[in-house]
Structures are given as C-alpha cells and as structure tokens.
Design a protein with these regions (language model features):
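Eukaryotic phosphoinositide-binding membrane-targeting regions
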Residues: 196-278, 283-450
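Surface-exposed beta-strand-to-loop junctions
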Residues: 18-22, 67, 88-93, 326-332
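Short linear interaction motifs
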Residues: 21-26, 90-97, 259-271
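Polar helix-capping/helix-linker motif
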Residues: 18, 52-55, 87, 343, ...
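Helix-boundary capping/turn motifs
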Residues: 14-21, 84-91, 257-258, 277-283
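Long all-alpha helical scaffold domains
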Residues: 1-17
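Alpha-solenoid helical-repeat scaffold
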Residues: 25-72, 76-253
C-alpha cells in the first residue's frame, strides 16, 4: 500500500498491485485478441461464488463482488453498503465480453456467452441500481442489433432455404439447455476446438464454416434477446414464431370440406404397410388426411402435418404413386447439432396411391406448391419477429408487404374441435328438439339474406 504521505492515487495503485488474483481475473475476461478459454473459467469462478450457499460475506466484500449477506449486521447501512459494493472494472469487463458477441471475427463460444449473461443477471439482482440496469439493457440492445445485421445476410442470401429449419432447431436447443456447474463436461478443460470432427456440441466449440457460423449467431441472438427482455422486465410473446392467429387443424377434428378440393387416395403407412382409404386436403400451412364423416360435406381428420416439413417424391415405376415424409418438430439432441445428426423424427412416412396419373400429378403439384408457400409464409413471419431485412434494404422488416398480408392466415375450413374417432361429435342439446341425430356433425350456419 502507499505510504502515509502518498495521495489517493498511490493507494489505489498499490491496492491494484496487491490484488493479483483479481487482476488475473480481469485479464482472463478479455476476449479481444484470443479465444474464450480463460474467460469461460473466469466466469465459471464468479458464477460458482454466487451459487455458493455457504457464508462468504467477508470474502465477497473484500473482493468487491455484490452479494446478499447471509448474516445480520448491527448497522444496516454498513451492511447494505458492503453488499452493493462492486469493482467497476469487473462490470466493464463483463460488458465488453457480452458486446464482443456482436463482432463477426470474435471467437466466443455460445456456452461462454450464456454464462456471461447469467453472471450479469446476478450482478443486476445484487446491485439493484438503475444506472447498471440501464447500461446492461443498452448493451443487450446494441449487441442484438449487430447480430441482427449478420443474420439478415444469412436469412436472405446464404441460407434462405435452410434458415427456418436452423432457427427452429436452435430455438429448441436454447429452450432445453440448462447450464449445470456439476456436469459442465471434461471437454471444456481443453482449448476450444473448431473442428466438427471433434464430436463436441456446437455450443462448446468454435463454429466452422458458414452454416455453423449462422447457427452459432442464432444461438447468441437468442441469449442476448433474453437478456434484453429480462432487463426490460418483459415476456417474449413473439417466440416461438407463429403464422397467423387461427389454430391449426388437429387429429380427430371435424372439418367442413364443402368448398375444398379433395383427392381420393390409398395411404400405405411405413413401416407397418397398413392400407387406409383417405382424402388428401391441403390448406396454406397443413397437409391433411381425412375420412368421410356421418354427414355429407364433412370429414374427420386422421392426420395433420405441416407442409413446410413435408418432402414429396414420385416413383419412377408407377406414375400413380407419391412418397411423402412429414417430419415432426425438432427435438433437443442432448449433444447439440453436428454434421449428420438426426434432429427430427418423421410423423408420417407413407406411399399415396391415386386412381390415375393425372390425380397423382395434381396431388404432387398441390403439395409442392403448398410447401413452397408455407415456407415462404414462415420465413416472412420469422424475419418480421427478428426484425430482419434484406441487405441494402432501408425498409424495416423481413419481406414485402404482400408477404406480410399473407401472414393473416384464414383457415378455409369450418373446424369443430374434439370430434370423437368415427367422425361424430356429441351435442349438448337433446336431439328431439331439432330432429337431428345426437352423434351427427353440426349443421352449417345459415346465411340470412335481406
């Protein structure tokens, strides 16, 4: 420490020289020149201190880390001042680390960014200071803006066809992954790898190639977006992305097909080879297989899947046959994404046999066109939520006005939810009052003409 005749600057300099561990911690948090190997363990140490349930008030006070005291003090003012004392250099180092996620050349892994966001939340809860709260919120907004600019190029130029699938998969990983200090993994003890052949999860290594870089940017965007919403004390009601406000058709619903184009076909489901007689229907978003109900013009839904997740192919040896695969929503992989990993389980693998090749061609054209339209709608809705716009476009938004007009999806069917199997729907009113059978679908609404 400085001598008796020295000023406050000498005392501060002497104190800084004696805090060897703290200075090493600050140096480790710098990711401007190197990778985040040291930064991860520095954040890991700080987060472990916050999560420690023991009595470490004196240690935290000496380290100038904000904390909630676990012991009563005689002087509440002194206790409050000690709890909320925070070295500004540490807070600035954390802010610079999170801000580095917006740079294109930064070697910051997703797991390190997630840990930094957790530590910043702990600081905000302990400090309870409006200025710190506003600084972190502004930091999250500026970082999210930088990430949005990088995602715009991927969404409209490099990966337009795959951007929907990549976002859905990374969003599932973001929602399911929970960081646990006791099972971090031995792979983090080694320097960060950038090779997909290492077998490491993408969030624990540096991305390689354009596709992995886009996925890592999406994951970083989701973490920074959550930090921003937490600082604003707001819920994220825009994710997951929805197209339109109307609910989707579900299995066992009863729908009015009076104004729909139906294609009769025989469905052979793989791998059981079960044969079913169905009618093929498609709206803006869904592929639907129905069977006739008890009333003319109505059908009971036996399968419903998203057109955006449907693949269609013909059979060279038979012009009446279509092969379809409808994939389910992405599932958490447990080891995150890597090349060749199966992220989706098919909901339906089937062969559709039509009466003739003309109906088969009509069905293929309808499904192919419907899939392209459904993916375009989902792409426009996703870009609207993420505030993405084409590179060089000064208009805010992710697509043309015609695309946004189509987001207000109108369900072409009159849907009765919850029909029992066999295309019947129980009515609340007695059948003797209206002369209808109790198990029949409801009557169509009567349009009054004046």
């Amino acid at each position: 420490k400085g001598g008796a005749g020295g000023g406050g600057g000498e005392e501060e300099q002497g104190s800084s020289q004696n805090r060897i561990f703290f200075n090493a911690l600050l140096s480790s948090l710098d990711v401007s020149m190197n990778d985040d190997y040291s930064a991860f363990f520095a954040l890991y140490t700080i987060y472990a201190i916050f999560e420690n349930k023991g009595d470490a008030d004196e240690l935290l006070t000496a380290a100038r880390l904000p904390h909630a005291s676990k012991r009563p003090q005689a002087d509440p003012c002194t206790r409050l001042e000690a709890e909320k004392d925070c070295d500004p250099r540490l807070l600035e180092a954390l802010r610079l680390l999170v801000g580095a996620a917006g740079r294109a050349n930064c070697r910051l892994r997703t797991i390190t960014l997630q840990l930094a966001c957790l530590v910043l939340r702990q600081f905000v809860l302990a400090l309870d200071a409006n200025d710190v709260h506003d600084q972190i919120r502004a930091l999250a907004e500026s970082t999210k803006k930088c990430l949005t600019g990088r995602l715009s190029e991927a969404a409209f130029v490099h990966h337009k066809d795959l951007f929907i699938d990549m976002f859905d998969e990374e969003y599932v990983e973001f929602e399911s992954f929970r960081l646990r200090l006791d099972v971090v993994g031995h792979e983090l003890l080694l320097p960060p790898s950038s090779s997909p052949m290492s077998g490491l999860p993408l969030n624990k290594r540096i991305p390689s190639g354009r596709e992995e870089t886009t996925r890592a940017t999406l994951a970083s965007y989701l973490h920074v977006r959550k930090l921003e919403r937490d600082m604003a004390d707001a819920c994220d009601d825009e994710l997951p992305v929805r197209v339109g406000d109307n609910p989707l058709v579900a299995v066992d619903d009863c729908i009015n097909l009076a104004n729909s184009d139906l294609l009769s076909c025989t469905v052979i489901v793989s791998p059981s080879n079960e044969r079913q007689s169905r009618f093929l229907v498609a709206d803006q978003l869904q592929l639907i297989l129905v069977e006739p109900a008890g009333k003319a013009g109505w059908g009971a839904v036996r399968f419903a899947g998203l057109l955006q997740d449907t693949s269609i192919s013909g059979e060279p040896s038979d012009s009446r046959v279509l092969h379809i695969v409808v994939e389910g929503p992405p599932r958490p992989s447990g080891v995150s994404w890597r090349v060749g990993a199966a992220r989706r389980t098919p909901l339906l693998q089937a062969k559709l046999i039509f009466d003739d090749h003309i109906r088969c061609m009509a069905g293929k054209q309808r499904l192919t066109k419907g899939r392209a339209g459904a993916r375009e709608l989902k792409h426009s809705a996703l870009c609207s939520v993420l505030r993405l716009r084409p590179p060089g476009d000064g208009v805010r938004g992710g697509g043309s006005s015609s695309h946004f007009d189509r987001l207000h999806r109108v369900n072409p069917f009159r849907v009765v939810t919850g029909c029992a199997p066999g295309s019947v729907r129980k009515q609340n009113s007695p059948s003797v009052l209206d002369g209808r059978e109790e198990d029949a679908p409801p009557e169509d609404p009567v349009v009054k003409r004046h």
